[in-house]
């Protein structure tokens, strides 16, 4: 006879999602929505730098293209490192304290960038420090996702994790859309902060607004988390958690997720700069065409993460129905083809070729949503419950280095070398997914 669920305290007693008698769907879904709200603010924090970097030189900073690529790459490096820490926290401190603490940590880089952009003499090294701190926003992913996984049965894991990751990923698009928009006017309560001059058009611009606009929402997330969330008594020490590295599926799924989310996050962080440097006002076309007629990275940068995150959120139920492996495979094939197509337009002869480049890039983001949703459905199905949370955290940590890898390689080998290198890596990863998971009679279907 099942032990009765006790949910009156802060810690859920006898919680077992696989048994209807010891699972409460209301608690599970409430946990999902509150932590997803906090995760969305976290991803806004992570990609704050990519929204601000394209306009820094317009307000008086004197940064090279290489320095701007590094600024947008450092949050990815930091995120990966932070995820290696956060992946161990869910069974140690519990969901409630984890989400609350994380929401408060988002305030540090927000306030830091608010003050930094006000002073154009801010040294580059300090901008790098603030960029590193922004990585906290993405780092919490490897804590939130395993934590949410404790609350749902396997049959709903694809839907739950797909919704959380997909909606959370929308924060990347949200900040790149809202950030440039709120730079255009004074925010309520901040009208006393004088705007800066936009050297590109002579107008005024409120760059600090991009850092300030989500501060109230981070505080709300902390309050909601502390008052509404509960903890699941899943306990595991460090030694018990690192046994995931003896399972070969950990490494194959890491490669697959590095393709899926690593590329999604890496291209998202660099998308605006790539547009500006190849087709926009920083490109060679600016010498012969009116810069005002050339595409602006800030106008298109949000589209990629919006599409990829939206598809990821919507595809969770389909992964529950058909399995994740086939969608990871289809996503990998599509990403390979679209990235190769985009690579053909990295040395354009006319600005009109931009639309081909944009189309292929948005196609790559679209298929990344398939692959991201698929891999996160596979993990709980292939791995035992205690290991699946750790593998979700680990793969998320490694894939989070995507923005850093993208920025580092683009600045060192150039965009064409980076794009074609991605094509080769995608082929390898997709082949592994087919051999081990997606083909008929695969050894580990999921």
Q: What function would you assign to each model-found segment?
A:
Residues 158-184, 395-406:
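Glycine-rich segments within core transmembrane alpha-helices of 12-TM secondary carriers
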Residues 70-88, 302-314:
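Central cavity-lining transmembrane alpha-helices of secondary-active solute carriers
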Residues 139-153, 369-383:
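Intracellular juxtamembrane helix-capping segments at the cytosolic ends
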Residues 49-54, 247-309:
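Extracytoplasmic gate region of multi-pass secondary transporters
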Residues 184, 215-234, 432-437:
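C-terminal membrane-cytosol helix-exit motif in multi-pass small-molecule transporters
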Residues 323-375:
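C-terminal transmembrane helical hairpin of 12-TM major facilitator-type secondary transporters
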Residues 172, 382-415:
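A late C-terminal transmembrane helix in Major Facilitator Superfamily
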Residues 92-103, 320-333:
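Cytoplasmic membrane-interface "Motif A"-like loop-to-helix N-cap segments
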């Amino acid at each position: 006879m099942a032990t009765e669920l006790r949910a009156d305290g802060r810690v859920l007693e006898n919680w077992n999602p696989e048994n209807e008698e010891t699972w409460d769907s209301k608690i599970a879904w409430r946990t999902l929505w509150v932590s997803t709200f906090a995760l969305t603010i976290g991803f806004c924090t992570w990609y704050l730098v990519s929204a601000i970097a394209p306009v820094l030189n317009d307000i008086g900073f004197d940064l090279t293209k290489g320095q701007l690529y590094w600024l947008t790459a450092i949050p990815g490096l930091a995120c990966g490192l932070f995820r290696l820490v956060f992946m161990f926290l869910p069974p140690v401190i519990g969901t409630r304290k984890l989400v609350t603490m994380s929401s408060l940590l988002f305030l540090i880089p927000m306030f830091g960038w608010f003050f930094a952009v006000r002073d154009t003499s801010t040294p580059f090294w300090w901008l790098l420090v603030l960029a590193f701190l922004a990585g906290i926003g993405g780092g919490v992913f490897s804590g939130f996702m395993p934590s949410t996984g404790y609350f749902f049965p396997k049959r709903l894991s694809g839907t739950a994790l797909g919704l959380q990751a997909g909606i959370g990923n929308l924060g990347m698009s949200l900040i790149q859309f809202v950030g440039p928009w709120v730079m255009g006017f004074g925010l309520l309560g901040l009208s006393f902060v004088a705007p800066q001059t936009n050297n590109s058009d002579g107008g005024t611009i409120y760059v600090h607004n991009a850092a300030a606009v989500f501060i109230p929402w981070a505080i709300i997330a902390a309050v909601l988390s502390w008052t509404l969330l509960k903890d699941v008594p899943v306990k595991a020490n460090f030694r018990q958690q690192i046994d995931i590295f003896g399972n070969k599926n950990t490494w194959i799924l890491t490669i697959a997720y590095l393709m899926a989310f690593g590329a999604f996050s890496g291209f998202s962080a660099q998308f605006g700069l790539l547009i500006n440097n190849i087709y926009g006002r920083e490109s060679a076309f600016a010498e012969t065409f009116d810069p005002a007629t050339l595409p602006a990275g800030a106008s298109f940068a949000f589209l990629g993460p919006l599409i990829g995150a939206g598809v990821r959120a919507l595809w969770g139920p389909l992964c529950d129905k058909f399995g994740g492996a086939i969608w990871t495979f289809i996503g990998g094939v599509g990403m390979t083809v679209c990235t190769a197509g985009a690579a053909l337009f990295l040395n354009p002869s006319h600005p009109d070729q931009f639309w081909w480049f944009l189309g292929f890039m948005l196609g790559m983001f679209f298929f990344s949503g398939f692959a991201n949703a698929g891999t996160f459905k596979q993990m709980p199905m292939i791995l035992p419950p205690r290991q699946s949370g750790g593998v979700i955290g680990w793969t998320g940590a490694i894939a989070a280095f995507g923005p850093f890898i993208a920025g580092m390689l683009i600045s060192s080998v150039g965009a064409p070398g980076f794009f074609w290198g991605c094509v080769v890596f995608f082929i390898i990863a997709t082949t592994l997914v087919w051999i081990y998971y997606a083909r008929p009679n695969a050894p580990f279907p999921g």
